[in-house]
UniProtKB/Swiss-Prot annotation:
CDD domains: UMPK. Keywords: ATP-binding, Cytoplasm, Kinase, Nucleotide-binding, Transferase. Belongs to the uridine kinase family. This is Uridine kinase. GO terms for cellular component: cytoplasm. Its main location: cytoplasm. It is an enzyme of class 2 (transferase). It holds the Pfam family PRK. The keyword Transferase applies. GO terms for biological process: CTP salvage; UMP salvage.
Protein backbone atom coordinates (compact mmCIF):
# COMPACT_ATOMS: atom_id res chain seq x y z
CA UNK A 1 0.00 0.00 0.00
CA UNK A 2 1.45 3.34 -1.04
CA UNK A 3 1.53 6.09 1.54
CA UNK A 4 2.62 9.19 -0.41
CA UNK A 5 1.36 11.55 2.28
CA UNK A 6 3.75 10.26 4.99
CA UNK A 7 5.65 13.17 6.53
CA UNK A 8 8.78 12.55 8.61
CA UNK A 9 9.73 15.13 11.25
CA UNK A 10 13.30 14.74 12.58
CA UNK A 11 13.77 16.35 16.01
CA UNK A 12 17.33 16.45 17.32
CA UNK A 13 19.58 18.27 19.79
CA UNK A 14 21.75 17.51 22.80
CA UNK A 15 20.85 14.83 25.31
CA UNK A 16 18.20 16.26 27.70
CA UNK A 17 17.69 19.33 25.51
CA UNK A 18 13.92 18.90 25.45
CA UNK A 19 13.53 16.79 22.29
CA UNK A 20 11.23 14.27 23.93
CA UNK A 21 9.14 17.02 25.50
CA UNK A 22 8.60 18.75 22.17
CA UNK A 23 7.94 15.44 20.40
CA UNK A 24 5.37 14.45 23.02
CA UNK A 25 3.66 17.85 22.94
CA UNK A 26 3.37 17.88 19.15
CA UNK A 27 2.20 14.25 19.16
CA UNK A 28 -0.46 14.86 21.80
CA UNK A 29 -1.82 18.02 20.23
CA UNK A 30 -1.91 16.64 16.68
CA UNK A 31 -3.55 13.49 18.05
CA UNK A 32 -6.36 15.70 19.30
CA UNK A 33 -6.63 17.52 15.99
CA UNK A 34 -6.14 14.68 13.48
CA UNK A 35 -6.68 11.46 15.41
CA UNK A 36 -3.96 9.34 17.02
CA UNK A 37 -3.99 6.84 14.16
CA UNK A 38 -2.46 9.56 11.97
CA UNK A 39 0.73 10.20 13.98
CA UNK A 40 3.43 8.20 15.77
CA UNK A 41 6.85 8.62 17.41
CA UNK A 42 10.00 6.59 16.74
CA UNK A 43 13.08 7.14 18.90
CA UNK A 44 16.58 6.85 17.49
CA UNK A 45 17.60 5.03 20.70
CA UNK A 46 15.71 1.98 19.43
CA UNK A 47 18.32 1.62 16.69
CA UNK A 48 21.43 1.20 18.79
CA UNK A 49 23.36 -1.76 17.44
CA UNK A 50 22.71 -5.27 18.70
CA UNK A 51 25.56 -6.22 21.07
CA UNK A 52 24.32 -9.65 22.17
CA UNK A 53 27.47 -11.24 20.74
CA UNK A 54 29.66 -9.25 23.16
CA UNK A 55 30.42 -9.88 26.81
CA UNK A 56 28.91 -7.40 29.26
CA UNK A 57 32.37 -6.01 30.04
CA UNK A 58 32.60 -4.94 26.38
CA UNK A 59 29.01 -3.75 26.03
CA UNK A 60 29.33 -1.21 28.86
CA UNK A 61 32.16 0.50 26.98
CA UNK A 62 29.80 1.58 24.19
CA UNK A 63 29.94 5.26 23.35
CA UNK A 64 26.23 5.91 22.86
CA UNK A 65 26.92 9.46 21.70
CA UNK A 66 28.97 8.42 18.64
CA UNK A 67 27.30 7.77 15.26
CA UNK A 68 29.02 4.36 15.03
CA UNK A 69 26.82 3.11 17.90
CA UNK A 70 23.76 3.27 15.64
CA UNK A 71 22.39 0.68 13.23
CA UNK A 72 21.72 3.47 10.79
CA UNK A 73 21.13 1.15 7.81
CA UNK A 74 18.16 -0.45 9.59
CA UNK A 75 16.75 2.96 10.54
CA UNK A 76 17.01 4.17 6.95
CA UNK A 77 15.32 1.04 5.64
CA UNK A 78 12.49 1.45 8.13
CA UNK A 79 11.99 5.10 7.19
CA UNK A 80 11.85 4.16 3.51
CA UNK A 81 9.36 1.40 4.27
CA UNK A 82 7.13 3.84 6.14
CA UNK A 83 7.36 6.33 3.27
CA UNK A 84 6.21 3.53 0.96
CA UNK A 85 3.30 2.62 3.20
CA UNK A 86 4.75 -0.53 4.79
CA UNK A 87 4.72 -1.37 8.51
CA UNK A 88 8.01 -1.95 10.36
CA UNK A 89 9.08 -3.79 13.51
CA UNK A 90 11.09 -1.33 15.60
CA UNK A 91 13.75 -2.91 17.87
CA UNK A 92 13.49 -2.59 21.65
CA UNK A 93 16.80 -1.64 23.30
CA UNK A 94 17.71 -2.43 26.91
CA UNK A 95 20.00 0.00 28.71
CA UNK A 96 20.28 -2.55 31.51
CA UNK A 97 21.66 -5.27 29.23
CA UNK A 98 23.30 -2.81 26.81
CA UNK A 99 21.84 -4.60 23.80
CA UNK A 100 18.59 -5.25 21.98
CA UNK A 101 15.94 -7.41 23.52
CA UNK A 102 14.14 -10.16 21.63
CA UNK A 103 11.06 -7.95 21.42
CA UNK A 104 10.03 -5.46 18.76
CA UNK A 105 7.30 -2.84 18.49
CA UNK A 106 5.04 -3.11 15.43
CA UNK A 107 4.73 0.34 13.87
CA UNK A 108 2.09 0.83 11.18
CA UNK A 109 2.28 3.55 8.51
CA UNK A 110 1.18 7.01 9.63
CA UNK A 111 0.58 10.30 7.91
CA UNK A 112 3.05 11.88 10.36
CA UNK A 113 6.11 10.15 11.84
CA UNK A 114 8.08 12.03 14.50
CA UNK A 115 11.67 10.78 14.66
CA UNK A 116 13.53 11.85 17.80
CA UNK A 117 17.22 11.41 18.65
CA UNK A 118 20.57 13.09 19.21
CA UNK A 119 22.42 12.05 16.05
CA UNK A 120 19.75 12.21 13.34
CA UNK A 121 21.09 15.12 11.30
CA UNK A 122 24.64 13.74 11.26
CA UNK A 123 23.47 11.30 8.55
CA UNK A 124 22.80 12.72 5.09
CA UNK A 125 20.32 9.92 4.31
CA UNK A 126 18.16 10.87 7.28
CA UNK A 127 18.30 14.52 6.26
CA UNK A 128 17.09 13.61 2.77
CA UNK A 129 14.20 11.51 4.08
CA UNK A 130 13.04 14.09 6.64
CA UNK A 131 10.42 16.57 5.47
CA UNK A 132 11.14 18.91 8.39
CA UNK A 133 14.34 18.91 10.46
CA UNK A 134 14.31 20.49 13.92
CA UNK A 135 17.22 21.27 16.25
CA UNK A 136 16.38 21.90 19.91
CA UNK A 137 19.01 24.40 21.03
CA UNK A 138 19.32 24.32 24.83
CA UNK A 139 22.41 25.49 26.79
CA UNK A 140 24.68 22.59 27.77
CA UNK A 141 24.62 23.43 31.47
CA UNK A 142 20.83 23.08 31.49
CA UNK A 143 21.10 19.81 29.56
CA UNK A 144 23.63 18.46 32.05
CA UNK A 145 21.45 19.28 35.07
CA UNK A 146 18.45 17.60 33.45
CA UNK A 147 20.50 14.56 32.47
CA UNK A 148 21.94 14.29 35.97
CA UNK A 149 18.49 14.32 37.55
CA UNK A 150 17.05 11.88 35.00
CA UNK A 151 19.84 9.32 35.17
CA UNK A 152 19.99 9.31 38.96
CA UNK A 153 16.22 9.28 39.54
CA UNK A 154 15.03 7.12 36.64
CA UNK A 155 18.02 4.90 35.84
CA UNK A 156 19.50 4.44 39.30
CA UNK A 157 22.93 5.76 38.37
CA UNK A 158 25.43 7.33 40.74
CA UNK A 159 26.39 11.00 40.64
CA UNK A 160 29.99 10.20 39.76
CA UNK A 161 29.10 7.82 36.93
CA UNK A 162 26.93 10.46 35.27
CA UNK A 163 29.66 13.09 35.62
CA UNK A 164 32.32 10.72 34.26
CA UNK A 165 30.22 9.81 31.22
CA UNK A 166 29.40 13.45 30.54
CA UNK A 167 33.07 14.41 30.56
CA UNK A 168 34.25 11.39 28.59
CA UNK A 169 31.65 11.13 25.82
CA UNK A 170 28.48 13.22 26.11
CA UNK A 171 30.01 16.70 25.91
CA UNK A 172 32.87 15.85 23.47
CA UNK A 173 30.50 14.05 21.08
CA UNK A 174 28.03 16.93 21.23
CA UNK A 175 30.74 19.36 20.20
CA UNK A 176 32.13 17.05 17.51
CA UNK A 177 28.95 15.71 15.92
CA UNK A 178 25.66 17.07 17.25
CA UNK A 179 26.22 20.82 17.43
CA UNK A 180 27.67 20.98 13.88
CA UNK A 181 24.55 19.21 12.58
CA UNK A 182 22.47 22.25 13.60
CA UNK A 183 23.36 23.82 10.24
CA UNK A 184 21.10 21.27 8.54
CA UNK A 185 18.00 22.08 10.59
CA UNK A 186 15.03 23.81 8.99
CA UNK A 187 13.88 25.05 12.39
CA UNK A 188 16.02 25.85 15.46
CA UNK A 189 14.07 25.92 18.73
CA UNK A 190 15.71 27.69 21.69
CA UNK A 191 14.56 27.03 25.27
CA UNK A 192 13.35 23.50 24.50
CA UNK A 193 9.86 22.36 25.40
CA UNK A 194 8.93 25.69 27.00
CA UNK A 195 9.02 27.56 23.68
CA UNK A 196 5.31 27.63 22.93
CA UNK A 197 5.61 29.94 19.93
CA UNK A 198 8.14 27.67 18.22
CA UNK A 199 6.01 24.57 18.90
CA UNK A 200 3.00 26.32 17.36
CA UNK A 201 5.08 27.24 14.31
CA UNK A 202 6.25 23.64 13.94
CA UNK A 203 2.69 22.33 14.16
CA UNK A 204 1.53 24.88 11.59
CA UNK A 205 4.26 23.81 9.17
CA UNK A 206 3.37 20.13 9.62
CA UNK A 207 -0.30 20.85 8.88
CA UNK A 208 0.72 22.95 5.88
CA UNK A 209 2.72 20.04 4.45
CA UNK A 210 -0.18 17.67 5.06
CA UNK A 211 -2.48 19.93 3.08
CA UNK A 212 -0.02 19.95 0.19
CA UNK A 213 0.12 16.13 -0.06
Amino acid sequence: MSNPSCIIIAITGASASGKSSISSTVHKELCNELGCQEIGIITEDSYYKDQSHLEMTERVKTNYDHPSSMDRDLLIQHLKNLKNGSAVDVPVYSYVEHTRTNETTHFTPKRIVILEGILLLTDERVRQLADISVFVDTPLDICFIRRLQRDMEERGRSLQSVIDQYRATVRPMFLQFIEPSKQYADIVIPRGGKNRIAINMLKAQILHLLNQK
